[in-house]
Amino acid sequence: MKLNELSDCKGAIRNRKRVGRGIGSGTGKTGGRGVKGQRSRSGVSLNGFEGGQMPIYRRLPKRGFRNFFAKDYNEVSLGRIQSAIDTGKLNIEKPVDIIALKEAGIIRRVKDGVRLLSDGELKVKISFNVSYASKAARLKIEKAGGQVHFPETV
């Protein structure tokens, strides 16, 4: 097979249906909209209106709410931190906090804090100032000789 022999699969490309172009076309006159009624008229359709049938947003019960006080944390794995250290983006002399992670390009946007997760391995001794760290992440950091601090202001 050569590049000039390539073609689309049968039925992959279909001609668009041109409606309202004469009765011989099969979709002339009413153009597939039926006869009369709100949905046959021109203009925008009503969002959520199902032709008089009880709409889905009223058939289903209300559920849950948006917690205004919920904290949105940046989740960072130890593997990503180790790769940033290996490439020289992260300085291990200073404690790692949310600003250091932002400058290293590990997180894009500063949120309410940092959540350390244990995915990957940490090979160097390093100190962290973070909002939260999983138990497994804490154990891996302490095994490598590092420390985890949870400042009140973070």
Swiss-Prot record:
Q: Name one GO molecular function term.
A: structural constituent of ribosome
A UniProt-annotated Pfam family: Ribosomal_L27A
Question: Which residue stretches belong to region Disordered?
Answer: 17-44
Q: List keywords of the entry alphabetically.
A: Ribonucleoprotein, Ribosomal protein, RNA-binding, rRNA-binding
- Gene Ontology cellular component list: cytosolic large ribosomal subunit
Disulfide connectivity for this sequence is none
Biased-composition ranges, Gly residues, are 21-35
A single GO BP: translation
Q: Can the keyword DNA-binding be found in this entry's annotation?
A: no
Gene3D superfamilies according to UniProt? 3.100.10.10
List the SUPFAM superfamilies hit by this protein, alphabetically: Ribosomal proteins L15p and L18e (SSF52080)
Subunit comment for this entry?
Part of the 50S ribosomal subunit.
Family per similarity comment: Belongs to the universal ribosomal protein uL15 family.
Function (record text): Binds to the 23S rRNA.
- Name under which the protein is recorded: Large ribosomal subunit protein uL15
The source organism is Bartonella henselae (strain ATCC 49882 / DSM 28221 / CCUG 30454 / Houston 1)
